[in-house]
Amino acid sequence: MSAPLPHHAQIIIIGGGIVGCSVAYHLTKLGRKDVVLLEQGELTGGTTWHAAGLVTQLRNSHTLIEIVKYGVDLYSRLEAETGQPTGFDQTGSITVARTEGRMDELKKITSLARASGIEIEPITIREAGEMWPLMRTDDLVGAIHIPKDGQTLPAETAKAMAKGAKDGGASIFEGVSVTGIRRSEGAVKGVSTDQGDIECEVVVNCGGMWSREIGLMCGVAVPLHAAEHMYLVTNPMGIPKGIRSLRDPDEQIYFRRDLEEEGAILMGGFESVAKPWGMNGIPDDYIFSLLEPDWEHFKVFWESAVNRVPAMKDAGINRFYVSAESFTPDNRYILGEAPELKNFFVAAGLNST
């Protein structure tokens, strides 16, 4: 039998994906012990369980670079600290350019990353081909290499942070739905759930795709929406352990070694015009669910992928995933206290991009 909900907590976190688990973990590291995380289903449900798990430090602002730089450091030590396997594999990454304009952009980002202490270097087309032997390179003009990038298993990483949070004194409750945010005099006072009310001083909205609806409970605007994201896993094709993840931003596609199917490639893409989903609300029971495959929508990515890695065509497709992630209008994270309500914080809009 699970423990009853407390009547009071200093901080309540809504959402048990990787973001909510991370907030709980880091609050305990800061000495906060009276922390309660509420998850409507099971930990890692929603987006975390199916996320692609790319870990990259390639960003176009100093602030974002500092965030992802810290993430790499955290992932590199989290498993040893918590004893919970995370799947983190620091293989490095390659990003290729098909045009001079793209290469100029990568050089600018390289300069920004170096100023933030990121180990990053331009490499020749030949060097890129040696690092990724199955990659077609005759249409490329250049590439960059980030040795300390990698990949991880998001669900396992979230579980490791949840364990670290509990070890640090936080309490985690699954199967608890938040039904309202209690307010008084312009500030948070507590939450209502399907299992009773909890008074608190601070609420952190880490609801992922549900963050907008959670915000609406208390008059806070959280500008994000869900869209379909698709990726596939090939049949085994001899991809060795330790191979770097690969990005082709001109074609908006990415590749990495699949961490579950030995020797296979995981490939996905981010279209400029994505398919919105859940515009009439995200179902509460959309926890470990997939959407109907839409091969016609994904086909352009497959064609680009086969152009970049021709051996994929003969290998064939083992699995095709279609699920939902949340996106913001400017593709930036939403982090901080809401201006509409004191002590109501939002950590949302983080996704596979």
Regions found by a protein language model. Name each.
Residues E66-K69, T95-E105, I144-K166, F173, ...:
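Short beta-strand to alpha-helix junction loop
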Residues L5-V19, V36:
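Beta1/beta-strand and adjacent pyrophosphate-binding region of the FAD-binding site
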Residues D197-R244:
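Central helical "cap/lid" subdomain
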Residues A52-M131, Q252-F255, E262-A264, D285, ...:
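Dinucleotide-binding Rossmann-like beta1-alpha1 core, especially the glycine-rich loop
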Residues I144-E201, W210:
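Helical element adjacent to the flavin cofactor pocket in flavoenzyme catalytic cores
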Residues A221, P236-A348:
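Active-site lid/adjacent beta-loop-alpha segment flanking the redox-cofactor pocket in flavoenzymes
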Residues Y25-K29, E340-T353:
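Conserved mid-domain beta->alpha element of the FAD-binding
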